[in-house]
Amino acid sequence: MELLREFLRNYGERFKEELENLVKKYVQGEEDVVLLKMDERCLILPFLNVGDFFYMKARELTEPVKLEVLQKRDSEVLARAISYEETYIEKRQHVRVQPDKPIPVYIKEKDTVGSILDISVGGIGVFLKEKVVEPEEVVTLEFELEGEEIKTKGECRYTIPYRAGYRAGFKFVDLSTRYENIIGRYVMKRQMEILKELKESMI
């Protein structure tokens, strides 16, 4: 339940409650379909109907997963994850995912290698051992994603102390359509993987 605790928003955001107070059991479904057994005291339950949308938050995502109600019987709701392509296009500046394994990123002008903490088609968060960049600096970022080499400019938005080093946030500058598509596909893939992990953790 830990990955599901942050919150559950209904389609109109008329009510907000912690997921642990709403869901009795989280059951794995087929592919991107899940069965939620809701607490009958859940305030949004009477308002959820077939075709409605609601959102479920996972710790690894900065944006909720959008779900569509397929069936509803008493306190059970069968829902399907909506196309992540639609989600990242609508909110692509904000939907970030954490890599499942370390991804090194080379900052050319500083001759420094960092590690990607999170990524979206809008930018990346990078772990650095030393504070080598300042806000508003534009640098060249080079990294590999799913076997594809990416080289693009990034503007540093902030640098803050983080663990035993620093976290720097970069906004991509003039990202090409090709690179945007590569990153977008990766983000969607990771969202699907995270949703699967989230379901499996509740079995």
UniProtKB/Swiss-Prot annotation:
Origin species: Aquifex aeolicus (strain VF5)
Gene Ontology molecular function: any one: cyclic-di-GMP binding
Protein's name in the database: Uncharacterized protein aq_1211
Matching Gene3D superfamilies: predicted glycosyltransferase like domains
One Pfam family recorded for the sequence: PilZ
Family of this protein: To A.aeolicus aq_820 and aq_1583.
UniProt cross-references to InterPro entries, sorted A to Z: PilZ_domain
SUPFAM superfamilies cross-referenced by the UniProt entry: PilZ domain-like
Domain PilZ: 90-188
Membrane spanning residue stretches: none
